[in-house]
Curated annotation (Swiss-Prot):
Disulfide-bond pairs as recorded: none
A GO CC annotation given for this chain: cytoplasm
Matches recorded under PANTHER family: UREASE ACCESSORY PROTEIN G
Protein name per the record: Urease accessory protein UreG
Statement: the UniProt record of this protein carries the keyword Isomerase: no
Transit peptide among keywords: no
High-level lineage: Bacteria, Pseudomonadati, Pseudomonadota, Gammaproteobacteria, Enterobacterales
Gene Ontology molecular function, alphabetical: GTP binding; GTPase activity; nickel cation binding
SUPFAM superfamilies from the UniProt entry: P-loop containing nucleoside triphosphate hydrolases
One BP term from GO: urea catabolic process
Amino acid sequence: MTDKSTARKKITRIGIGGPVGSGKTAIIEVITPILIKRGIKPLIITNDIVTTEDAKQVKRTLKGILDEEKILGVETGACPHTAVREDPSMNIAAVEEMEERFPESDLIMIESGGDNLTLTFSPALADFYIYVIDVAEGEKIPRKNGPGLVQADILVINKIDLAPYVGASLDVMESDTKVVRGNRPYILTNCKTGQGIEELVDMIMRDFLFTHVQPEGEQA
């Protein structure tokens, strides 16, 4: 029989993947303060191949918002998708270390290194995953399919403010996304202005944390 006094709650693990420069780190940086404001206790793990630069960046950005000890960089030394799918042992060890140190946490975000459209997360590592693409990669990106983009629990189409500068139609990108993803959710975001970010947090809380999202204007 399990001793309830020592039983540890399940901390939800969310993978965040996508190509280099799509805004994975920026997404983490903008959703973290909102999650904290809503009472969620997050942890963050970032992946880089030969550095821990993303972790350093996140620590600088979230200084005074999230304790630095709750942000961990993993230097994988390997292909990004290998470290989160084929052999996620380094990341699993990092996750277990963080869960052991901060058992009161609700959520751990695991950012992969930048990779191509085939990147997915091993279910041994992540319970859910978000895939981030950006408009500057080209209007045709959703049409290219790829398991990462198609199978993600949430697809984020980021940097929508750049659409007019790169000749991309957001209407076309949305239409193509609906074709390749069916009913799977997606959202358009702009990390600089905050467009779509609150809604993304709503989706995370509702679909990943199974937490009631209070409609705007509703009294607690």
